[in-house]
Regions:
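P-loop/Walker A NTP-binding region and its immediately flanking N-terminal helices
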Residues: 1-120, 127, 144
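Structural signal for conserved beta-strand scaffold positions within catalytic alpha/beta enzyme cores
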Residues: 84-86, 147, 165-167
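Conserved catalytic/switch belt of AAA+ P-loop NTPases
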Residues: 105, 130-147
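A short beta-strand-to-loop transition that corresponds to the Sensor-1 phosphate-sensing loop
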Residues: 119-120, 147-152, 170-172
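Sensor-1/coupling segment of RecA-like P-loop NTPase cores
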Residues: 124, 139-156
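Conserved AAA+ ATPase core "coupling" helix
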Residues: 156-185
Length: 185
């Protein structure tokens, strides 16, 4: 099966790509989409890559063409409607999370959505998780939260229960070998 170009860097994750492409298609048709997604998987599975590809596909007029300005901006980490968040130190503090929640509530600049890609969401302190929960419970209508963590159990149940779960697996060796061969490595 051929997938949108935005998902091209996801090796061995066809089930996940199918799930995300269906969500992008539903959003493009006006059916809307879940406001919070939790991408889980062990290190090297591509959870942050999947979340970034999903953001690109949601913001692309062609559902993830990989060629337009929007797709390039997301790939470069410079799209004004995508807030890419990493912890300042070992964990996310409540101040950083509250600032993020305020930014997330602003209207998108170029696209239909304001997307918050929250890498290592499992590293939020308890107070930060509570601030995040409030934003996820009462989302802005044009904000989509993409949380990344190794395991769903790494986040509080109250947050997990409000997210659509996307579970990535470690890619099979043969899939990785095919990708490396295709890349000329």
């Amino acid at each position: 099966m051929t997938h949108a170009a935005a998902f091209g860097e996801l090796t061995g994750q066809d089930v996940v790509v199918d799930q995300l492409e269906r969500a992008v298609s539903a959003a493009a048709s006006g059916a809307g989409t879940m406001h919070a997604w939790l991408f889980t998987g062990p290190p090297g599975s591509g959870r942050s890559v999947a979340a970034r590809a999903f953001a690109a596909a949601l913001l692309c007029g062609e559902q993830g063409c990989g060629q337009c300005a929007s797709c390039h901006l997301v790939a470069a980490g410079t799209h004004p409607d995508v807030l890419l968040v990493r912890p300042d130190g070992l964990s996310y503090g409540v101040r950083q999370t509250r600032d993020l929640v305020l930014k997330a509530a602003t209207a998108p600049v170029l696209g239909r959505w304001r997307i918050v890609l929250f890498e290592d969401a499992d590293r939020a302190t308890e107070q930060a998780a509570n601030a995040l929960l409030k934003a996820i419970e009462e989302p802005s209508p044009r904000t989509i939260w993409l949380l990344c963590a190794p395991y769903a159990d790494d986040l509080p149940t109250t947050i997990r229960s409000r997210c659509r779960l996307v579970t990535l697996r470690t890619p099979r060796t043969d899939a990785v070998a095919r990708t490396l061969e295709h890349e000329g490595v």
